[in-house]
Amino acid sequence: MDATRTFFGLPNVHNVPLCLTSNLSLFPQRLLQKHTLPLKPAKKHHLVCVRSTKSSDDLEGSRPSTYFSPSLWGDHFLSVSLDRGEFDELEREIETMKPLVKDMLMSSQSSDKEKIRLIHLLVSLGSSYHFDKEIQDILKHSFTKLDDIIVGEDDLETISIMFEVFRLYGHKMSCDAFDRFRGEDGRFKESLAKDVRGMLQLFEVAHLGTPSEDIMDEASSFAQNHLDSWIGGNVSGATPHLLKHIQNSLYIPRYCNIEVLVAREYISYYEQEEGHNKILLKFAKLNFNFCQFHYIQELKTLTKWWKDLDLASKLPYIRDRLVESHLGGLGPYFEPHYSLGRIIVAKIIMTMVVVDDTYDAHATVPEVAVLTECLQRLNIGADDKLPDYLRTVLESVFEVMGEIEQEMRPKGRSYGVKQVLERFKNVAKADKQLTEWARTGDVPSFDEYMKVGLVTAGMDGYAGYCFIGMEDVSEKEAFEWLSSNPLIIQALNVMFRLANDVGTYETEINRGEVANGLNCYMKQYGVTKEEASQELRKIYSNNKKVVMEEFMNSHDHVPRQVLLRCLNFARLFDVMYTEGDGYSEPKGKIEHFMTSLYVHPIPLS
């Protein structure tokens, strides 16, 4: 128990600091919340318990009353026409321009700093994957002489960019490099506030810290305070497009956002930059539109598949979130060559959502027991007494996973499907326990809840979904690494569990699911909801730092492409749970994100 508490970063029960905010978001209140939304007076929320006059048999036999809003998209993508000629032209232009960009990157006339700045720009524009090998070679060589490169460098933006690029590619550049920007009192110098771009870059890289690097927390607070004060003000050297870029970064910092959304916003910003490189800008626009073609084709394929399954009408209690599930595949990898992977991830996510919603939102306790037993066997027995809807659920799981296995077998990648199903068995057993708590109104301790909740987080399964379609990595080696229960996966489980529990708190409590992490924390420590949410944010933040540390420390024995998926999972959580549960209720910010990725191409002129 003590080891568990240490890993979660749990506070002393008698020393829980107060939090006066009424906002339940897992993340600090961002600019848009501070400047555009009126804050309601803080109210104290206490532990929610369910008391019922029903017998235990009645409670176990009760069916929850749950409503999810309909799909925002329906069959929209079936009616979207794609011009194959336009697609081919985009591909030709990209291939024509790639040598030009590569020549810039490999130029012998460029210094190490200039090359690293160019790499940073390519990453920001979403184009770096075209030159991944070249970039890794450049950075591997540059990192060996890092001390010589940064000696005497006193530009905050330059140091911050180098810090970001090296860490993103697995080289742990020391945060001691920022000591040059601190005064004798150990604090960051106030004179830095004049450097708008440097402060913005410092704020972004502050999210790449590890658990032992307190200086990065100081950098984040210092930079954010100054950036906040500039919004709405008249800062010398800050143009309107730069202020808008700052506003976007404060709302969702780069490393709390998925790569393709970062690129979409940065392209618009870079186009307005004076002296931008026209070749790089055009290449980035072509690349984004080329990627978007893939996404739309994937969604056309997925929409037809989902329509043919007809589960949304057969099982009206489930969340009809196909496009949001595709976003769940786009977060881990946005590149065109992972198109098959995204389709597989979206299919499995939707299949798992069907099962999850059956546990959470529809099945009775006896039905849950039968469902769990069938999932352990991975078949429906002749003696199983199943209601029709439950048979539909199970048949859909077996059918979808069977089709994926059959599709991947000729590619020599069916091993992963079996591994994912084995992991899913564990999730099903844990879901059964959560359902029993929910139906009986039991609120376990936070420690007891997390033992089960971390299993239902299922990040080893999510990673497995992604590995199935990654033909550039050894499937067996990737799953063997997963089976070692790496620390990065453990930390991701904590992050997802807490993000989901805070984001879905109101919804779950309203339908009687009192076994929620936030509620359980309130019970164990005798604190209010506001105090509990503050502590869960700290635990979330600590585990995100663990993810970053393990990402860098594992590059010597785990393929970079595997580790990137894990880093990108953490970024996806931040997007999905910025404002509540963006997957279940996407209306608003998530809808806007999806529209920018799936509907509107970038004008080329």
Curated annotation (Swiss-Prot):
GO terms for cellular component: cytoplasm. Mg(2+) 2 binds at D356, D360. A motif (DDXXD motif) lies at residues 356-360. It is an enzyme of class 4 (lyase). It comes from the Eukaryota. Mg(2+) 1 binds at D356, D360. One of its GO terms (biological process) is diterpenoid biosynthetic process. Signal peptide: none annotated. Pfam families: Terpene_synth, Terpene_synth_C. Predominantly expressed in flowers and siliques but also in roots and leaves. CDD domains: Terpene_cyclase_plant_C1. GO terms for molecular function: magnesium ion binding; terpene synthase activity. The keyword Lyase applies. Binds 3 Mg(2+) or Mn(2+) ions per subunit. Its EC number is 4.2.3.-. Keywords: Cytoplasm, Lyase, Magnesium, Manganese, Metal-binding. Pathway: Secondary metabolite biosynthesis; terpenoid biosynthesis. It is found in: Cytoplasm. Mg(2+) 3 binds at N500, T504, E508. Transmembrane segments: none annotated. The Asp-Asp-Xaa-Xaa-Asp/Glu (DDXXD/E) motif is important for the catalytic activity, presumably through binding to Mg(2+). Belongs to the terpene synthase family. Tpsa subfamily. This is Terpenoid synthase 18. It comes from Arabidopsis thaliana. The lineage of its organism: Eukaryota, Viridiplantae, Streptophyta, Embryophyta, Tracheophyta. The gene is TPS18.
